[in-house]
């Protein structure tokens, strides 16, 4: 992926991921991790319907630092500030759509949504809709020929202080997680992970290798096949919690696939070493 870190250590990567999970509330951290792991799993599992995660938190909730470090599962350069994709700061909707197409089966971090930048909430909701509906629009090139639109398979991970809520259908495509504010307090656990972020790609590589190993196809298929059953269970729970909830089935599908992606990850030995001791927090 984005650059290489020679000598990445799986053991150090596991230590770093353990710190990341514990740097924020483990239940929140594991939900984000499951989405990042689901991105390359999605097509292997035969699932349809991607979703985004929006991490809401005040300045000082460490949401960006956490996400950048976790993204290092797919390459150490995701920790570099210059590569951070910021909403409204040089990243137009068209530019982000182009990057989403290039991200293929990976997560895409879009940082720092603010309602008063980059076209505001309306543009942001349209962007979410376009990314998760699966592609760019067909356009004509300079020769008036139809240019082939690129399909999109990435999973957007977004951060911001305010959640855009202009469109119920688009919001239903996004799991919103509120990160607790950490008012100026040094987070030594997160710092421990950041100092070892260049090793995290060893875990990402182990995950990709495990997914590509045909010996694991059976367990992936077995867990993936529980999607509809888990979606119905989540829908029942959601409608019981909030009667008449709009788009309950869509939200339930997001929760079900996140849950099952985590269950698949527990079968990957490199990840299981980190995840099994904290698995009860992912609910």
Stretch-by-stretch model annotation:
Residues 107-131, 161-172:
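Conserved AAA+/SF3 P-loop NTPase catalytic/coupling segment centered on the Walker-B
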Residues 150-152, 167-272:
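Phosphate-sensing "switch" segment of ASCE/P-loop ATPases
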Residues 50-54, 107, 155:
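Residue-level preference for the first positions of well-ordered beta-strands
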Residues 65-121:
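AAA+/P-loop NTPase substrate/partner-engagement loops
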Residues 1-83, 255:
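P-loop NTPase catalytic core of nucleic-acid-dependent motor ATPases
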Residues 124-141, 146:
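Conserved catalytic/switch belt of AAA+ P-loop NTPases
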């Amino acid at each position: 992926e984005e650059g290489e870190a020679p000598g990445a250590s799986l053991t150090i990567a596991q230590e770093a991921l353990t710190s990341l999970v514990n740097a924020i509330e483990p239940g929140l951290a594991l939900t984000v991790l499951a989405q990042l792991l689901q991105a390359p799993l999605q097509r292997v599992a035969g699932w349809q319907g991607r979703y985004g995660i929006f991490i809401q938190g005040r300045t000082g909730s460490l949401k960006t630092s956490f996400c950048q470090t976790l993204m290092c599962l797919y390459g150490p350069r995701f920790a570099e500030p210059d590569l951070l994709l910021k909403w409204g700061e040089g990243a137009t909707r068209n530019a982000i759509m182009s990057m989403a197409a290039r991200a293929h089966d990976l997560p895409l971090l879009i940082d720092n949504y603010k309602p008063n930048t980059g076209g505001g909430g309306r543009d942001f909701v349209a962007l979410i809709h376009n990314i998760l509906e699966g592609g760019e629009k067909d356009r004509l090139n300079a020769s008036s020929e139809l240019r082939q639109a690129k399909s999109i398979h990435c999973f957007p991970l977004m951060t911001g202080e305010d959640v855009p809520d202009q469109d119920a259908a688009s919001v239903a495509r996004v799991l919103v997680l509120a990160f607790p504010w950490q008012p100026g307090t040094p987070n030594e656990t997160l710092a421990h992970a950041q100092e070892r972020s260049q090793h995290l790609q060893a875990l990402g590589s182990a995950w990709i290798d495990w997914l590509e190993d045909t010996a694991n196809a059976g367990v992936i298929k077995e867990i993936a096949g529980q999607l509809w059953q888990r979606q119905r269970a989540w829908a029942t729970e959601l409608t019981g919690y909030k009667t008449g909830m709009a788009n309950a089935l869509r939200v339930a599908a997001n929760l079900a696939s996140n849950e099952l992606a985590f269950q698949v990850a527990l079968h990957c030995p490199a990840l299981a070493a980190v995840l099994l001791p904290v698995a009860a927090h992912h609910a």
